[in-house]
């Protein structure tokens, strides 16, 4: 039962997330042999200021 956590800067629409979730689900099913009904995709929306790389704040592009 795969769980995939996707962390993105906030601002994606529900429709965009649905497309991303569908493609992730299809890829895992194809390459790992898991049934699509067992694959969970969880989105975490990150507000700006919550992600740092190399000590520097990452900004939305």
Curated annotation (Swiss-Prot):
**Which residues act catalytically here?**
2
Q: Which InterPro entries match?
A: 4-OT-like_dom, Tautomerase/MIF_sf
Q: Which UniProt keywords apply?
A: Isomerase
| Enzyme Commission number(s) from the entry | 5.3.2.-
State the coiled-coil residue ranges. Answer: none
What GO molecular-function term can you cite, just one?
Answer: isomerase activity
NCBIfam families reported for this sequence: PRK02220.1 (NF002571)
Membership in a protein family: Belongs to the 4-oxalocrotonate tautomerase family.
What this protein is called in its record is: Probable tautomerase LL0574
């Amino acid at each position: 039962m795969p769980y995939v956590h996707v962390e993105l800067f906030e601002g994606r629409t529900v429709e965009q997330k649905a497309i991303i979730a569908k493609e992730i689900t299809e890829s895992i099913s194809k390459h790992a042999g898991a049934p699509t009904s067992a694959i969970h995709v969880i989105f975490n929306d990150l507000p700006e200021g919550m992600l740092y790389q190399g000590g520097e704040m990452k900004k939305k592009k």
